[in-house]
Amino acid sequence: MRVGKKYKNVCIPICISQNVIKFCEEMRYLGVYVRSGLILKFNFDQAKRKFYASANGIISKVGTLKPDIVLSLCNSFAIPCLLYATEAMLLNKSERKTLDNTVRRLFMKLFHTADPSVIAHCQYYMYFLQPSDNIIVRTFNFYQSLINSSNTIVQIIFSLFNKNISNFGEKYNIGGNKLKQQLWGGLLFRQ
């Protein structure tokens, strides 16, 4: 698999012990599916499939009459399948929107509506962060854990790339202990 300007160019096959290693368009590494392309991209099809399987399993057992219980269980079991390792990825806007739409589908099923404003209000009053907001929280916590790491190698590597966390705080105008509350305050107005 290749990433960069020449990702479409044909390469000489790599051989190890007379076995040819084939180039592929997509690969799985540590549970994350990475696609070849001009820039590094991720494939969330498997993550969405696992999310839907978990959410549908929960709904089949609990039903849609108790959405608070369904959402609590989905937050514990289905959302981690969808957001696995996203805190370490630099996702573009379309990838974040794809993840948001996946959860929006769950709300459509639970509340029997397709109206975006109704879904936004349901998310707000059920205290359910969108995946894109959840990724912001997870990324911020990930950066904080790198800063506070006792491993000196991690600290050195992170200090080389520490622009990310200051840019991150400036981009979202967030920081400190009230990160979720700051994101929560603007949830309805971003729809």
Q: Where are the predicted features?
A:
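Extended C-terminal regions of large enzymes
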Residues: 125-191
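Short, conserved micro-motifs composed of acidic
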Residues: 1-26
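Short helix-interrupting loop/turn segments at helix-coil junctions
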Residues: 108-118
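Active-site-proximal structural scaffolding
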Residues: 71, 99-100, 135
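Basic, alpha-helical interaction scaffolds
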Residues: 18-90
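Short amphipathic alpha-helical coiled-coil/interface segments
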Residues: 98-107, 139-142
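Alpha-helical bundle/repeat cores within regulatory domains of eukaryotic proteins
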Residues: 119-125
